[in-house]
Curated annotation (Swiss-Prot):
This is U11-theraphotoxin-Hhn1a. The lineage of its organism: Eukaryota, Metazoa, Ecdysozoa, Arthropoda, Chelicerata. Residues 1-21 form the signal peptide. It comes from Cyriopagopus hainanus. It is found in: Secreted. The keyword Disulfide bond applies. Its main location: secreted. It holds the Pfam family Toxin_22. Disulfide bonds join C75-C90, C82-C95, C89-C110. InterPro entries: Toxin_22. Probable ion channel inhibitor.
């Protein structure tokens, strides 16, 4: 009976001591995993930031192209209203007050010289 008790006690002591070692190993593993997770999150965050910056650069580039294409024409054609203080009539045209048929518009138009 004593041998059974001694054997049981020996097995119990080994189990407890190995269990503590496993507990320490588990704690170390968990720390490593959380550190790896943090580094992965940092990597993912940096990657997302780079993609957003590229997207922003493309959008700004498209805006600048759009503004270049949508600029106003350089001159105004014949029969088109113009501003007497800032005439933008094309060459060969003059910004004049309309005669007869356009009197009621109270505006200036580009006419041939």
């Amino acid at each position: 009976m004593n041998t059974v008790r001694v054997t049981f006690l020996l097995v119990f002591v080994l189990a407890v001591s190995l269990g503590r070692a496993d507990k320490e190993e588990n704690r170390m593993e968990m720390q490593e995993k959380t550190e790896q997770g943090k580094s992965y999150l940092d990597f993912a965050e940096n990657l997302l930031l780079q993609k957003l910056e590229e997207l922003e650069a493309k959008l700004l580039e498209e805006d600048s192209e759009e503004s270049r294409n949508s600029r106003q024409k350089r001159c105004i054609g014949e029969g088109v209203p113009c501003d007497e203080n800032d005439p933008r009539c094309c060459s060969g045209l003059v910004c004049l007050k309309p005669t007869l048929h356009g009197i009621w518009y109270k505006s200036y138009y580009c006419y041939k010289k």
